[in-house]
């Protein structure tokens, strides 16, 4: 990897372009990420996606929240975290209990009761 200061970066591209160019054609220069000089701090080029998140995460000093709003927000955040943790834990190790053995089928009586009239028994059975 080649580390260059920002001012040397422009000179290097021009030099590479002149070395690689043939008369009548443009030369291909491999892209090089410029590095910051010693006096600068930070990164020269940040991804647009990073800028998007940085802009959304900035805290505006003009906007103030009351104590009640802060406590309510804190309560809702903690509540949602606890709720998520409970739903995650409830899925682990929970099994439907095995039911007890089912009772047997009822047994058919083998003997008829002697108190029933025989004519009535013929109609029933």
From Swiss-Prot:
Keyword Cell cycle tagged: yes
Function: Probable cyclin-dependent protein kinase (CDK) inhibitor that functions as a repressor of mitosis in the endoreduplication cell cycle.
GO molecular function: protein kinase inhibitor activity
Keywords from the named record: Cell cycle, Protein kinase inhibitor
Domain of life: Eukaryota
UniProt keyword Thylakoid present: no
InterPro entries hit by this protein: SMR11/SMR16
Name by which UniProt lists this protein: Cyclin-dependent protein kinase inhibitor SMR16
Lineage, top ranks: Eukaryota, Viridiplantae, Streptophyta, Embryophyta, Tracheophyta
């Amino acid at each position: 990897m080649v580390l260059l200061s920002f001012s040397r970066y422009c000179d290097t591209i021009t030099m590479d372009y002149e070395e690689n160019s043939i008369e009548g054609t443009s030369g291909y220069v491999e892209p090089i990420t410029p590095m910051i000089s010693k006096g600068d701090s930070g990164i020269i080029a940040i991804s647009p996606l990073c800028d998007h998140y940085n802009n959304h995460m900035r805290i505006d000093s003009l906007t103030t929240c009351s104590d009640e709003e802060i406590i309510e927000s804190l309560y809702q955040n903690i509540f949602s975290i606890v709720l998520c943790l409970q739903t995650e834990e409830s899925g682990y190790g929970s099994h439907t209990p095995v039911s007890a053995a089912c009772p047997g089928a009822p047994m058919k009586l083998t003997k008829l009761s002697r108190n029933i009239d025989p004519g009535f028994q013929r109609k029933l059975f």
